[in-house]
């Protein structure tokens, strides 16, 4: 890979901290959106990269934040040259990444992990299904990138010899970027879904990890607090900046609180009858009843579960509807029988990211 003039001449600022968003940082339209960028997903990398957006400090090759997120991903993972080392130009050298396994620090670790994955899945594709963004080039761009990974395990990996199996599963990466550097990321690789599709028993892999934990695990209380509070507002946007009518922040926080901490009545009130859910460990289902059962299974295992919303941002407006990204965290004690085998009495930390669409409700639904 030949370094561009931008790469040769850029000055990087170390040790950035992610600033929380406010209501004014949310895009009120869809001019810069994945739907328009991909022409309603009819193309993956378009000829026209879309409207020019202020991107101070970013490589001028990128037109807007959607273009940046989609094309750096494609360049790293899928081009003929497969420029894995380009990660060093779009992740800060001291980047902080919270993932399935714990806390990863620095772009070199990301580069190493990516080489491992591309060797295990030489035909890998990372197909963007949605990108929700907010922010700007002063406070930072916050992006929630929903990607479907597709590939065939024809290479050796940390899970053993090549299995020859085809995989397809969702990944969500919530990033904060300034001046061409992603410096904070909360990413859920959905490792359990990948393992199941590869024919690897997730329980056996969990036992192996317990005896030989990877870097960043177990997660300390300090790291857990950092995971929850990084980029989070000290006070919810809906409390610090009240608005009349529908408020995506208030809606998302109320919905999560009701579903996970209370009686779950919001499922019937706000979810479509045939809504589609896809989540961790290859969970795929549709409809309110299936979702209610999923929530019941989790709460049965962790009867004292308490969930809190850490960050909400969104795109949209009342006429076109809303795209909402919500990052949450929860704590509970493994006290119940069920999907996680015999209760251990251990305190557990759970976190996740959720992307969903919401039409504007009627006044009588608020």
Name each region found by the language model.
Residues 186-196, 362:
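Short, solvent-exposed aromatic-acidic interface loops
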